Structure formats: structure tokens, C-alpha cells
């Protein structure tokens, strides 16, 4: 004797069963590091992280001198003060998928995919993308980019005045 089972779905239940898994979120960040006319220029250390009220800060990337012998570049990470206080002091560097080399002046595009590195999947709500730069023998600056995440994604932009130029972010699926 052979027993067989059939399940018949109709309407929205059928559409739900056929739906593909939700695509990963991608956060594209465009960051401008201004060219400076100073006698001794050092590339800035840059930290990018996400904050949401009531949730721990999530480091997306920390750009510093990763090639310095004996991880010597990590010594100066505490100069990226706001990031250091928010989440840096608890991070072991170099962190896989998070640490990267410093960048030269110019416009840079960085992309973060949910589930990789430090990028979480963002539920709808209000977030702040924090971008902080600090330079040896230079200044430091923090730029806050507000992101109102909806099911459709989010967009935000802000601009620095000295160590950072324009910063924009686009969250999409």
C-alpha cells in the first residue's frame, strides 16, 4: 500500500511559497577625504560604524595602517575617539572583514553586505551612520549620517568641514 500526500496552495499562500529568500542588504557609502596643503601629511585613520538607540554600536570598517610592523598601527586607533568609546576598545584588530588600509585623498566607495564583516541586517527604524577621521599631527572630525530604514531601503548624506568631505549612504536590497 502506497500513501501519497498533496498540498494545494492558492492565492497569496502560493505566492509566498514561491517567493525567493530575501536578498541581502547592501550599504554603499561614498566618502570624500579632502586634499590638504600641509607640510607633513599623514593619511587619516577612518572608522565607520552604525548606531541605533538602545543597541550596541556595530563597526563596519576601520581604516588604519594595517601594514605597520608588529601591528603597530593599532596603537593609534584610540585617537579615533568616538569610535573607540562606542565599540573600538572591545574589538580585536586586525579584524577579519572589518580592518583595511588607510586611503589617500579623494572620493572612495565602500560597500557593506549584511551578514559579512560587521554589517548586520537592518530592521526598519532610525539609525545613524557614524564616520570619524583622525590624522597624526592633524585634526579629527565626526560626521553623522541619519538613515531612516524602511522596507524599501534608506538614503542619507552629510558633509564634514576639515578632515572629511561629503559622506553619503544608500541602503538597498
Predicted feature residues:
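Sec/Tat signal peptide C-region and signal peptidase I cleavage site
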Residues: 18-24
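Glycine-rich, aromatic-bearing surface loops/beta-hairpins
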Residues: 105-110, 118-173
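Short coil-to-beta strand junction motifs in C2/discoidin
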Residues: 40-47, 124-126
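Bacterial N-terminal signal peptides that target proteins for export
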Residues: 1-11
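Structured domain cores in non-transmembrane regions
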Residues: 53-122
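Beta-strand signatures of extracellular beta-sandwich domains
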Residues: 47-49, 61, 130
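Short amphipathic, basic-aromatic surface patches that mediate peripheral association
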Residues: 29-41, 64-67
Amino acid at each position: 500500500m502506497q500513501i501519497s500526500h498533496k498540498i494545494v496552495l492558492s492565492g497569496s499562500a502560493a505566492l509566498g511559497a514561491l517567493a525567493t529568500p530575501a536578498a541581502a542588504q547592501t550599504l554603499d557609502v561614498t566618502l570624500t577625504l579632502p586634499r590638504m596643503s600641509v607640510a607633513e601629511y599623514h593619511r587619516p585613520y577612518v572608522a565607520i560604524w552604525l548606531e541605533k538607540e538602545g543597541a550596541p554600536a556595530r563597526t563596519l570598517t576601520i581604516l588604519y595602517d594595517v601594514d605597520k610592523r608588529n601591528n603597530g598601527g593599532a596603537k593609534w586607533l584610540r585617537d579615533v575617539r568616538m569610535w573607540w568609546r562606542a565599540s573600538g576598545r572591545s574589538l580585536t584588530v586586525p579584524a577579519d572583514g572589518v580592518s583595511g588600509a588607510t586611503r589617500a585623498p579623494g572620493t572612495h566607495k565602500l560597500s557593506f553586505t549584511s551578514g559579512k564583516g560587521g554589517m548586520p541586517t537592518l530592521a526598519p527604524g532610525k539609525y545613524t551612520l557614524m564616520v570619524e577621521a583622525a590624522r597624526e599631527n592633524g585634526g579629527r572630525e565626526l560626521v553623522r549620517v541619519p538613515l531612516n530604514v524602511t522596507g524599501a531601503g534608506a538614503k542619507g548624506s552629510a558633509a564634514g568641514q576639515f578632515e572629511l568631505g561629503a559622506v553619503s549612504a544608500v541602503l538597498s536590497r
